[in-house]
Amino acid sequence: MSKVQDASSKKTKTISKDSKSLRNTKQPHHSLPSSLGEEGMVRSFSKDIETKSLRKRLLTLANKYETSSFLNGDPSWFMHQVIGKRNQETIAFIAACLSYGSRQVFLPRIQYLLDCSRSEPYEWIKTGRYALDIPNDNQCFYRLYTNAMMCDLFHALRKMYEEYGDMENYIRNYANLQKGSKKTDAITAIEAICDHFLKHEAIGIVPKNTNSSCKRVCMFLRWMVRTDSTVDLGLWSDLIDQRSLIIPFDTHVIQQSLQLGLITSKTASMSVARKLTDKLLEIFPNDPLKADFALFGYGVNQK
């Protein structure tokens, strides 16, 4: 064999050996970041499916229960029994204030007040005629509310009507002073209502501030603001954006929301109520309180 052939043979062997070495060398593994990895994508996909499934479930329940039959045995029924925007606003607020405890007990008390007003609750308050029907004493009117407390509530409401005409206009003025805008959000409206009754020393019925969940005030605002509903009136839809409404938050809503995994806290505070509402906004972006009917329906189906 010639020297040239020998050199060529050696070179071929070297290349073959180097190729084998390269094949045996482990190549670096370029994995995706954890947030984009397969596991993360599966979790994200699963969460998306769960959200869609929950939305479908809640929407079905909401459509089933948000009907005119819902009014039967509900305090919202009273605002549908009077004529005129101011009458509806007035009896709705009074009904909301009394809506706690047993419906079999508080519904007749609301009916009593409506009867006293002869279905004209706005004038009954504004003219002070309530004083002829409700004695200013410490006798019980309903549960923790005395006659005197009810008189204080009506007196503060009368002052509001004398100065601003109605509650809607009072909140509009309050929002204008606070934010320089004649349209506002629900939390500002709640603050406005709390501030007025505290200022006029109507204590024990309307919350002093927004530290608590203000469940009954939130329910009243739902009645006044939500549109396209057979239950809610939507009288203030041009004042408050319904997307800013806060869920009326009580023990029943807490239990149902915990079971559905919407919240983790059992505290009936405004902060937890707003966190739940934020979750509901993800499901119902334009109308979070439609979910109030769904949660009610979910509770009924659990019994």
Language model segments and positions:
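HhH-family (HhH-GPD) DNA N-glycosylase catalytic core used in base-excision repair
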Residues: K3, K10-K11, K26, P33, ...
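Ser/Thr/Pro-rich low-complexity tandem-repeat tracts
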Residues: S9, I15-S16
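Intrinsic-disorder-associated, low-complexity terminal segments enriched in Asp/Asn/His/Tyr and depleted
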Residues: D18, N24, H29-H30
